[in-house]
Swiss-Prot record:
It holds the Pfam family RimP_N. PANTHER family: RIBOSOME MATURATION FACTOR RIMP. Keywords: Cytoplasm, Ribosome biogenesis. It comes from the Bacteria. The gene is rimP. The lineage of its organism: Bacteria, Bacillati, Bacillota, Bacilli, Bacillales. This is Ribosome maturation factor RimP.
């Protein structure tokens, strides 16, 4: 089951590259009785439109029908990663410098496992965030291997 995203990445990447788009993430999840293959794509500058998603969906659907790499029945969804796009690759973190992000860690750091704040730097798989706790700002350094989830967030 965990191999599905990497198999699909091999098929989707050439399609996405040919359309000058970016492959952001792939999920293969079961919700209720149904399986969903979700492919998140974007433009390099951000802001993909529905026609671009449809192009990826049509091409990928044909290729999936031909190669048939997934044994379960599933629904294919191709969409934008949204405003709270995941941060997984080095390039994702580098693009997010200066932006407001949410990070959840596997184990507590400074007695906390969830952080929201501005990403101030990212070097050598380590990120530095400026986090607001009540009325004070603190700097938190988190190694990428300790991150369970990272995504862009909306600052209210």
């Amino acid at each position: 089951m965990s191999k599905v995203p990497s198999l699909i990445e091999e098929l989707a990447k050439p399609i996405v590259d040919e359309l000058n788009l970016e492959l952001v993430d792939i999920e293969f999840v079961k919700e209720g009785r149904n399986w969903f293959l979700r492919v998140y794509v974007d433009t390099p500058e951000g802001g993909i439109d529905i026609d671009q998603c449809a192009q990826v969906s049509e091409r990928l659907s044909l290729l999936l029908d031909e190669k048939d790499p997934i044994t379960q029945n599933y629904y294919l969804e191709v969409s934008s990663p949204g405003a709270e796009r995941p941060l997984k690759k080095d390039a994702d973190f580098e693009k997010a410098i200066g932006k407001f992000i949410y990070v959840k860690t596997y184990k507590p750091i400074k007695d906390m496992k969830e952080f929201q704040g501005y990403l101030t730097s990212y070097e050598e798989h380590t990120l530095v965030m400026e986090v607001r706790i009540k009325t004070r700002k603190i700097t938190v350094t988190i190694e990428q291997e300790k991150i369970a989830l990272a995504r862009l967030a909306i600052d209210f």
